[in-house]
A protein has these predicted regions:
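Long, low-complexity intrinsically disordered regions
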Residues: 1-216
Length: 216
């Protein structure tokens, strides 16, 4: 058995930072899509956050590794301004709401299946009180997508103490369909999500890729 290698705290920090791409040399010229793809291939996930102080959260990891870069190039790769069916990243739940390479979508289908097994309490309430709503929202997206939550025509409820998001039932239905993979984000305008059928957003070769088994 080989001897155990010991690292100091400083060495361990440097290893961790290098693994995340911080040791790579920055481009000397204009940053383009090739450089951004290199970062995305390395880190695989860009967390999305609605909080906007300095800049939107998903722009910052790329900036930290490349320095100034054209944000519209990242937008194009993420699908926010990509041609339908050609985004290189898509939105879904990883450790949090994130942008993820489209090629990893099959690896997240286990989580999409879980939406049927473990529905949210709000969805159980809707299924009991308004069972037609989910089908109505599905049809609305099919006929008119991409749509915003506001396009469901359901008003936002009065603010409730302790409830951060205060979603109306139309938004809950869309987010549930998003969780189960039936819809995805087609674009964002002023950071507002537009939902459309996943089959109209993601590349067909991704959608037709086999689903790994639970053991895999």
């Amino acid at each position: 058995m080989s001897a155990l290698t010991r690292l100091s705290a400083g060495q361990a920090r440097r290893v961790a930072l290098a693994a995340q791409g911080f040791a790579d040399p920055r481009p000397t010229g204009r940053v383009d899509a090739r450089h951004i793809r290199r970062v995305l291939d390395r880190i695989a996930i860009l967390q999305i956050d609605s909080v906007n102080v300095f800049s939107r959260a998903h722009y910052l990891p790329v900036f930290a590794r490349l320095g100034p870069y054209p944000r519209e190039t990242l937008d194009r790769l993420t699908g926010y301004t990509a041609a339908p069916g050609r985004p290189e990243m898509f939105e879904y739940w990883a450790h949090a709401a994130s942008l993820i390479p489209v090629g990893l979508q099959p690896l997240l289908r286990w989580r999409m299946r879980r939406a049927h097994v473990e529905p949210w309490p709000a969805i159980r309430r809707i299924a009991k009180d308004n069972p037609e709503l989910l089908d109505d929202v599905r049809q609305l997206v099919t006929d008119n997508g991409p749509i915003r939550a506001g396009d469901t025509g359901i008003p936002r409820p009065a603010p409730r103490p302790g409830h951060m998001w205060n979603w109306h039932d139309g938004k809950v239905a869309l987010e549930y369909l998003f969780y189960e993979g039936w819809v995805t984000t087609a674009k964002r305008i002023n950071f507002e999500r537009y939902y459309d059928l996943t089959e109209r957003v993601l590349p067909p070769e991704v959608l037709s890729a086999p689903t790994p088994s639970d053991d895999d």
